[in-house]
Regions:
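Nucleic acid-binding interface residues in structured DNA/RNA-binding domains
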Residues: 1-104
Length: 104
């Protein structure tokens, strides 16, 4: 039987380059409201970059966390990774968030 985290990773693998999703969308895709559980799974992701956890952002379109951090060099790294995939970011927010949001 697959764990909650493994199921979350399976969904995240479906998010293509240049798109993002949210903790909330992944939880919805799993049929739950365990948004924080999704966040914990992403924090512990042992399969990066195959499971592209840098593509998970907050529901507001802001960066959220990355590698267990919410500021500093980890967020700078997340922004660089997303920009390299063509995601437009201003400050710590995605410019065209609703257009590139991947829903399950």
């Amino acid at each position: 039987m697959r764990t909650f985290a493994e199921k979350a990773y399976d969904l995240l693998r479906k998010v293509p380059e240049g798109r993002v999703t949210t903790y909330k969308e992944i939880a919805r895709g799993l049929g739950t409201k365990a948004y924080r559980g999704v966040g914990q799974a992403m924090k512990r992701n042992p399969y990066a970059p195959e499971v592209p956890w840098h593509r998970v952002v907050a529901s507001s379109g802001r960066m959220g966390g990355f590698q267990g951090k919410t500021s500093g060099s980890s967020i700078v790294k997340k922004i660089k990774m997303l920009k390299a995939e063509g995601v437009e970011i201003s400050g710590d927010k995605i410019k065209n968030f609703e257009e590139i949001l991947f829903r399950f």
